[in-house]
Amino acid sequence: MVEINKVAILGAGCWRTHAATGITTFKRACEVADETGIKEAALTHSSVTYAVELKHLAGVDEVVLSDPVFDADGFTVVDIEEDCDVDLDEFIKAHLEGNPEDVMPKLRDYVNDIADDVPKPPKGAIHFLSPEEMEDKLDIVVTTDDAEAVEDADMIISWLPKGGVQPDIFKKIIDDIPEGCIVANTCTIPTRQFKEMFEDMGRDDLQVTSYHPATVPEHKGQVFVAEGYADEEVVEAVYELGEKARGLAFKVPGYLLGPVCDMASAVTAIVYAGLLTFRDACTDILGAPVDFTQNMAVEALQMMAKFMEEEGLDKLEEALDPAALTNTADSMNFGPLADTEILPKALEVLEKYSKKAE
């Protein structure tokens, strides 16, 4: 049986990018505040929301959040009542009643105004609670020492920055990570690359999976757990932990984690819906064999990927007039492809892009 009694989270995040999108809210953080009775939980974001959930909803004995930014001069705490003129109780109420935009514009505007003056991590970050408040109000352990955080940990969640930073950080603490420890990536590094990173450091013993939110954690309660790298019982344990902590959990083949969870999920959703409706139109209505249908779909996907790679995403219309497909794909406009309106809408979009290219 896999037991997860101590979780170390590396990296605390910064809310500036969340404010910049103009769409994210604190819906999940406010739900956690409501469920736990800890009002300050509503003011958490990024991995801090994770920490509260794991401690108070999943019942993990010890949750440690580590980031050198906690000691940085640029660590900036925004007081939503004094700085943004938003009452905390009203903030929570608005989110729970489904009206987050009654309060969110003031937070976004304030953070966007100060963002240029606050250094980016690790020299600075924007939060709504101080490290002391995180410890006192949220009952989690806060540290700037990654080695201390991972000591005796059963699971490590990496909320570290994107790019080539993660290997350099993990190299410093690789010998401090317990044997057989579960290590989970989030949205800043692909699971495959995460696993290869540890293999390159001689740590084949580590159980690699993911704890990917597919959005910012304070906005929506969900987590995606990668299959295919860690032992099945480990994946199951992390999945069950995620269900308790985040409210909703999904198991996803590790190689699909990025396409399902990152920005290109918008592309994946369209492609997946197309595959499902194309399959049913061909097999159920035309009576085509599934292997024949699959081969046709595979060729379409592979050749479109090749087309984009060879021509460039910004030059697609120059290489192939989108209207070309409006005169071919319309012959498949029946059954599920038509009933769901996926193909008619696609043809409409292609026609618009064809006219834009003229």
UniProtKB/Swiss-Prot annotation:
| Keywords, alphabetical | Methanogenesis, One-carbon metabolism, Oxidoreductase
Q: Which GO terms describe its molecular function?
A: N5,N10-methenyltetrahydromethanopterin hydrogenase activity
Thermal characteristics: Thermolabile at 90 degrees Celsius.
EC number(s) for this protein? Answer: 1.12.98.2
Q: Which Pfam families match?
A: HMD, HMD_N
UniProt key word Oxidoreductase:
yes
Q: Name one GO biological process term.
A: one-carbon metabolic process
Q: How is its activity regulated?
A: Activity requires salt; 100 mM potassium phosphate, potassium chloride, and sodium chloride are equally effective.
The answer, when asked if Oxidoreductase is one of the entry's keywords, is: yes
Which reactions fall under this protein's catalytic activity? 5,10-methenyl-5,6,7,8-tetrahydromethanopterin + H2 = 5,10-methylenetetrahydromethanopterin + H(+)
Q: In which pathway does it act?
A: One-carbon metabolism; methanogenesis from CO(2); 5,10-methylene-5,6,7,8-tetrahydromethanopterin from 5,10-methenyl-5,6,7,8-tetrahydromethanopterin (hydrogen route): step 1/1
Top class in the EC scheme: oxidoreductase
Q: Which HAMAP family match?
A: HMD
**Assembly and partners?**
Homotetramer.
- Assigned protein family: Belongs to the HMD family.
Query: What's its job?
Result: Catalyzes the reversible reduction of methenyl-H(4)MPT(+) to methylene-H(4)MPT.
Q: What's this protein's name?
A: 5,10-methenyltetrahydromethanopterin hydrogenase
Record the organism. Methanopyrus kandleri (strain AV19 / DSM 6324 / JCM 9639 / NBRC 100938)
Give the classification, highest ranks.
Archaea, Methanobacteriati, Methanobacteriota, Methanomada group, Methanopyri
